[in-house]
Amino acid sequence: MHVMNCVSLASDKENGTLATAAAFMTGQTSPSASPPPPPPPPPPPPCPHSGEGFSPSPPPPLPPPLPGGPPIPPPPPPGLPSVSYLNGYSSLGKKKRMRSFFWKTIPEEQVRGKTNIWTLAAKQQHQYQIDKKTIEELFGQQEDTSKASLPKRGGALNSSFRDAREEVTVLDAKRSMNIGIFLKQFKKSPQSIVEDIYQGKSEHYGSETLREILKLLPESEEVKKLKAFNGDVSKLSLADSFLHCLIQVPNYSLRIEAMVLKKEFLPSCSSLFKDIRTLRAATKELMLCEELHSILHLVLQAGNIMNAGGYAGNAVGFKLSSLLKLADTKANKPGMNLLHFVAQEAQKQDAILLNFSEKLQHVQETSRLSLDITEAELHSLFVRTKSLQENIQLDQELCQQMEDFLQFAVEKLAELELWKRELQGEAHTLIDFFCEDKETMKLDECFQIFRDFCTRFNKAVKDNHDREEQERKQLQRQKEMEQKRYSWSTGELGSFGRSSSENDVQMLAKTGTEDLPSFLKPRPNSPSYRPPNTRRSRLSLGISADRELLTFLESATSSPEDPNKFNSLPRSSPRQARPTIAWMEPREQQSHGPNFTHEPQASKIQEKAPPPAWQNQLPTTWREEPASPLPLAGRSRPSLRKRNSEPVGLGPTQSPPLLPLDLGVREHELVTGLTQFDLQSPKSLEEGSQLTLNDFCPTKLPSPGDRSSQPFAAGGDSLPPKDTDTQEVLSPAGEDDRTISDEPSSEALVSVVVTDTEDKDAGPLLYVSDTTDCSLTLDCSEGMDSRAGGDKQEEEKEGDGSVSSGAGEAGSSQVSSNSVSSPPGEVPAPKSSKSELSCQGGLPKDRPSRGKDAIAPKRNSFKEASVGASKPVSARRSQGVTTKPVRTLNSSENEHMRKVVPISKSSRGAGPWKRPEPTPKATPRETPSSTDTPLSRRSSVRGTSDTSPRRPQVSGSGAEEPRLPRSSGSISGRPGKDAPLQPRASFRKPSAKPLRNIPRQKPEENKVSSPNSPDPESPKEEPKAPQATGVSRALPPIPSFARNTVASSSRSLRTDAPPAARTTGLTRTVSQRQLRVKGGSEDSASKDIGTLKRASSARASKKCPESAGGSSANVETSLKGRGTTERSSLRLKDSGQATLGRILRPLQK
């Protein structure tokens, strides 16, 4: 139970004396394991130790001693003093205060008189003593504690606690605690605080503090208890002491209340003065603000207007509460209501009215005030002061203390009362001013209405201002837009206002088609310019061709107007003249014989167009040979057709007014690419051209009186330049133009001479502007078909406006070939002009007269014709010269040409001129071969699709047959119906895919020299041309109506001239199909015919076997032409290998 005992037990456990513990539990004494501690000051006498046992203590029986255990020291003498000592309370106890050990003790009654561990330990405790000195050092407190402290702790302290408990009986413990906490904040003794209360010194305490003291005042019972306390006051607690002292002050409660009132009166009085002053000022503002009154009158007027005729109309006033309903009345204008309108009207009347709220400042301040609250505060202050004044009279001392304050308070309260009365009066006046009921309308409510009205009115003013600003900005933007629109409409921005197409359509709608010719004239190059769409479908090509045919017709009849007017159609070159068609020419000219027309115009063209210098440099023979064919292409150069779209008539077929358009200078200028000269075989070129002329010459054209000759006469405008230029002018200008126009026109096919010329000179010139070429793809088979003839017939008959350039080209090239076949020096005056006239006339007007070949060259579309011509020329050049040809605009490649007019097979077949049935070979194939140049153009339009290998064009029928599927009804397809079939040659509709700048192998000289001189371009005619060459000189009797036709000429040519040679020349069309076929047949043809076959287009190559036999008559001449033609075609081939290689390889295989 005692500390020492615990320590002893712990020591025993540490020493492992469990036996001793067990002995204590059983009441035995175990021998001490360690030497006994020093005995107390009066040590008891030591007992003898026996090694075998312990000295038993007398009272309890000792257990048997453990063997070997040390003897147990003798127990202390029995008695409480020993226990007292053990507990440390004896005189021998600690002299130093120790730290407390917080444990829970067992009550003494539970330990005494019972056998337990604690009683056992008490008996043996004298043997196990704690070292007091050590424990005091370790756990003793530094300060000395007197021995009396212990008894004080047990006695005196307990007595003090007992005294406190007695005071607590006076005050509740919790209350005493709260009071004590409150008193500690003053840092003063309770007596000092009570003294200040007694003297009325409130300066050191706040009103809140004094109010707290009032709350802590003792109750009556507590007062009684405190008064009944007679003990030492110093022994009372802080709270009890404070209350005991406080109750000793007389009227302590009244004094404290007086102190609180004195402390709060001034602040409360000042606040009341301020509030009353504010309310009075607000009342005056509402009554004196004229701007507010004006606004209210505006509201009254607006309300009367809106309510006119109703029960609420014609009002003389309105309740103030109605002001808040203004914003609820919405206007028709979004975001606007009646309040906005009133603000807007106030702004119109006077902008000062909008600022009325600035004069109601005190009204805004009244938001935190209330008249009722102010009156209540004033009344409370007055009651308190009066009560204090009455109560203070009982205590003279207190009365003296508060006298001054009370006097001051009474005065202030009287003043406040006066102000309150004035405020009330003014409030009533204000309510009456606004005609409100004093009973129901309170001053606070009135102020609140005007506060809200001011806020809403200011917001409405701001909204109006924002709206006006927004409208102003919007108007400004609109004005700017109007100015821009005006500037655009007035053309300030130049040509960007409207597109040329819009202007063109509008003008055409107003003026009709009379201005169409102007659209077809060259257009200045511009960023917006683009070549005609190369992906036109056949239908679109046909429509475009029809439209352009109309244009050509119009232009032929109408005087040349401003060339740039409505020039919306793209042109390959602004310098190219629009090709004229024979049927476009005035009928007076048409009535003239072909010779008559051709010669004068040819001379004119020769005069107009001086030969280029490079042409002059060329061998005369070479220049002369192409001269005849080139004049067709070259002289008709002013009338150069676009490969894609322009009619066959390349020569100046236009009426005399249009003749000025045929400028030789243009021809020279059109040469855009580098010109390559092939001086190797000028003679061969000459010969080839002569052969071609001869071949064409044998193909005798009917007299001008014939229907076919009439078309030639019509085409005479374009042909005469060619005729006259045939040798001289042709070689310079004609060659140039021809090289330019050869690709687009079938003229390239017309004669080997032309091909050679092109090979040498035009080879580089062969490059034709892509304007029309883009839309053209070589379609030899298609072009070779009796498209030229058929097309010509249909175009002439239908007036589609789709004059197949192929036909015209073919015709022109044939004419040139005829002229070339006559001696180079000579220009076949009647015959060549006749043939040329026939060709041109056939092209523009009597395309049937061109014969089936001419029809074949006449492609369904101008694009086709143009492409065909350009391709054959390219073929010839490539053969003749390895150098890559420079592509230039051909006469058939007028800038104006955009689309090919697809001519229905029936229409082409139904050409007015029927040629005698060609030999089955030549008929289908030959006609295409003669038409190859135009057809190749068509193939250039369709050629891509037609690139599939076709039978050799040498035999017109053979080569034609593949085309016949396309141009069913072509002349070759219908040998019996030569004339109609010839028109069908133009069956071949240009492939939608145009080939651009694809060098075409020049048709072999055989083709060129094919008697289809009227349509040298058509590959079909070319194969027959070799045969016809001989026949043309010995033409079998042919009906007059068919003599001028290409069919008749091709027949005769077929009979005589070796078709292979001519096919090669005519194959100049080099449609992709022909090129493919060329792989096989052209090789054979080239072997037989030499360069002429090489020049022939792929179809011509196909036809080569057939035409080779037919062309045996003219082998020599054709061979000569072949040399040149092959060189040129070789050039074209080389240049076109890249593009045509892909097409030719499969076909050749």
Swiss-Prot record:
Q: In which tissues is it expressed?
A: Brain, heart and lung (at protein level).
**PANTHER family referenced in this protein's UniProt entry, alphabetically:** FORMIN-J-LIKE (PTHR46345:SF11), INVERTED FORMIN-2 (PTHR46345)
SS bond partners:
none
Q: Where is the composition biased (Pro residues)?
A: 33-48, 56-79
InterPro entries with a match to the protein in the record: FH2_Formin, FH2_Formin_sf
Q: Where is the FH2 domain?
A: 88-483
**Broad class of where this protein is predominantly found:** Golgi
Q: Name the encoding gene, please.
A: Fhdc1
Name of the protein this chain belongs to: FH2 domain-containing protein 1
Cite a GO CC annotation. cilium
Q: What residue spans carry the Basic and acidic residues bias annotation?
A: 464-485, 784-795, 844-856, 1123-1134
GO biological process, alphabetically ordered = cilium assembly; Golgi ribbon formation; stress fiber assembly
Q: According to its record, what is known about the domains?
A: The FH2 and MBD domains are essential for its function in regulating Golgi ribbon formation.
Residue numbers carrying Phosphoserine: S501, S645, S655
Give the SMART domains listed for this entry.
FH2
Note down the stretches annotated as region MTBD.
Answer: 960-1086
Task: Give the protein's biological function.
Answer: Microtubule-associated formin which regulates both actin and microtubule dynamics. Induces microtubule acetylation and stabilization and actin stress fiber formation. Regulates Golgi ribbon formation. Required for normal cilia assembly. Early in cilia assembly, may assist in the maturation and positioning of the centrosome/basal body, and once cilia assembly has initiated, may also promote cilia elongation by inhibiting disassembly.
Pfam families recorded? FH2
